[in-house]
Swiss-Prot record:
Protein function: Essential cell division protein that stabilizes the FtsZ protofilaments by cross-linking them and that serves as a cytoplasmic membrane anchor for the Z ring. Also required for the recruitment to the septal ring of downstream cell division proteins.
Compositionally biased region (Acidic residues): 124-133
Keyword field: Cell cycle, Cell division, Cell inner membrane, Cell membrane, Membrane, Transmembrane, Transmembrane helix
Superkingdom of the source species: Bacteria
Entry GO terms, CC: cell division site; plasma membrane
Annotated stretches, region: Disordered: 48-151
Segments on the Cytoplasmic side according to the record's topology features: 23-297
Family statement: Belongs to the ZipA family.
Subunit structure: Interacts with FtsZ via their C-terminal domains.
Bilayer topology annotation: Single-pass type I membrane protein
Protein name, entry field: Cell division protein ZipA
Length: 297
């Protein structure tokens, strides 16, 4: 059998390809040791002044930890001292408020609910709600309020809801305080409680709550031994920007107090507070807003 030119070319091509593959495989096997040797040699010849292998192996991390404490420890006492100073700032304010307690209590005493020690119900309230309006007028002309209490014009109308304790011992201080704090009232100006726009005690005052027993204030320093036969929620007009919404919040707070502490709701005429009375209060708010709008025109 004769082999032609085409068959010879195919055979030669196969031999050449096999030789190339064998040479490549031989170079790869022989080049592994050389490559590793060259790498090790290149690392060993790195200059020492640039850090050498220390930059690669990681001792620099130990050096970095020594560089971290760059804070001046002498500054720490000053920071803590300034923090303590900020915490102590409200204390003088509280002290000044106590200093005004005598004058504030005198004002509230003139406009309180004239609660007597006797359990007779007619003695729990004054003859009319004019005392609340007069009290609101005096409070607006008293010493400047804190930042959270905005000075308001004299009240033309005052909506009053009183809560009378059914228990002879009256409302106990700790339980009363817990209840009104849950309703968002905060202790403030005139040593009474105020409900602000924010539950945290910020924004304008929506309504207030006073002690119905003379002198009409609350003593937080002796709240554990405090008790009262009645408290009164009152909202003055003009007052909050949205009086109807503020009145609804006041009704909810009074109902919560009466429900949880066994109290009875009364209006400003010493009568039981009914749904009709609440609706009448709302109509008074609407009429007041209408008159105010007419006067502006």
């Amino acid at each position: 059998m004769e082999i032609g030119l085409r068959e010879w070319l195919i055979l030669i091509g196969i031999i050449v390809i096999a030789g190339i593959l064998f040479d490549g495989w031989r170079r790869m096997r022989g080049g592994k040791g050389k490559l590793k040797f060259r790498l090790d040699r290149s690392y060993s010849n790195l200059p020492d002044e640039e850090g050498g292998s220390a930059e690669v192996l990681g001792p620099s991390r130990v050096l970095d930890t020594h560089k971290e404490p760059e804070l001046d420890e002498s500054d720490l006492p000053s920071l803590s001292a300034s923090a303590r100073d900020r915490e102590r700032e409200p204390k003088p304010v509280k002290a000044s408020k106590r200093g005004k307690r005598a004058s504030a209590a005198a004002d509230v005493h003139q406009g309180d609910l004239n609660l007597s020690a006797e359990p007779r119900e007619p003695d729990l309230f004054s003859d009319s709600d004019d005392d609340f309006a007069a009290d609101n007028n005096r409070s607006s002309g008293a010493a400047p309020a804190s930042n959270s209490v905005k000075e308001l014009p004299p009240a033309e109308e005052v909506l009053v809801i009183s809560v009378i304790s059914r228990d002879e011992g009256g409302f106990k201080g700790p339980a009363l305080l817990q209840n009104i704090l849950e309703s968002g009232l905060r202790f403030g100006e005139m040593d009474i409680f105020h409900r602000h726009e924010s539950m945290a005690g910020h924004g304008e005052v929506l309504f207030s709550m006073a002690n119905a027993v003379k002198p009409g204030v609350f003593d937080l320093d002796d709240i554990d031994h405090f008790s009262t036969r009645a408290v009164s929620f009152f909202l003055g007009l003009p007052g909050p920007r949205h009086p109807k919404q503020a009145f609804d919040v006041m009704v909810a707070a009074a109902r919560k107090l009466a429900h949880e502490l066994n109290g009875e709701l009364k209006d400003d005429q010493r009568s039981v507070l009914t749904a009709q009375t609440i609706e009448h209060y709302r109509q008074r708010i609407v009429e007041f807003e209408r008159r105010a709008l007419t006067q502006k025109r």
